[in-house]
Amino acid sequence: MNALYNHAVKQKNQLQQELARFEKNSVTAPISLQGSISATLVSLEKTVKQYAEHLNRYKEDTNAEEIDPKFANRLATLTQDLHDFTAKFKDLKQSYNENNSRTQLFGSGASHVMDSDNPFSTSETIMNKRNVGGASANGKEGSSNGGGLPLYQGLQKEQSVFERGNAQLDYILEMGQQSFENIVEQNKILSKVQDRMSNGLRTLGVSEQTITSINKRVFKDKLVFWIALILLIIGIYYVLKWLR
């Protein structure tokens, strides 16, 4: 249980740092930061649930009437922190979306006002049409494929597509990292449980041969698990390499 609690504290500290970064740069924060916060929130929620399950199982095994106040306070604190982090991230995300919408609205409005107030805009437009007239006649097919968008708008749209793709890849990588950390942490917990079970079997008078056969079986299961994990990581690597 202490290992789970320490892991939850580590995730909580990471969330505090990421939320502080998001709050400090609420307008210019990258989308990948939001993905990282979402992944850490999911991992923390999973850890809190596992901690609660361990406490209930410990209570049933020891036939205790109530959970130790120390562990109960830890669970209550983690649950409250998770709720606060989720609410804060929701508010920051809403503020980020509102600022984005306001910036886009003011940007488009300002560009229209500048065009209408500029006395030379009409003459410049005519000159541009004269200069581009010959090229547009030769490039009708290209402009029709582009949906009539100006070149800079097309490039901006393409850049936004790439940014969204990179954000998704960063989110996938962050999820993979969190999953790997959870797997390593669970493996440590299982190793400790195995040692305790072996000591318990020796205390009960079970022969060393039986304990050795059980440990061999556990080792085979571990070997299969690690091979599957390595194959999974290799598969994720090639998928990401293909997507990039």
Curated annotation (Swiss-Prot):
Gene Ontology cellular-component terms for this entry are: endoplasmic reticulum membrane; ER to Golgi transport vesicle membrane; Golgi apparatus; Golgi membrane; late endosome membrane; membrane; SNARE complex
One of the Pfam families matching this protein, by short name: V-SNARE_C
MF terms from GO for this chain are: SNAP receptor activity; SNARE binding
Which superkingdom? Eukaryota
- Provide the positions where the record notes the PTM N-acetylmethionine: 1
The role this protein plays is:
SNARE required for targeting and fusion of ER-derived transport vesicles with the Golgi complex.
Query: Would you tell me the protein name for this molecule?
Result: Protein transport protein BOS1
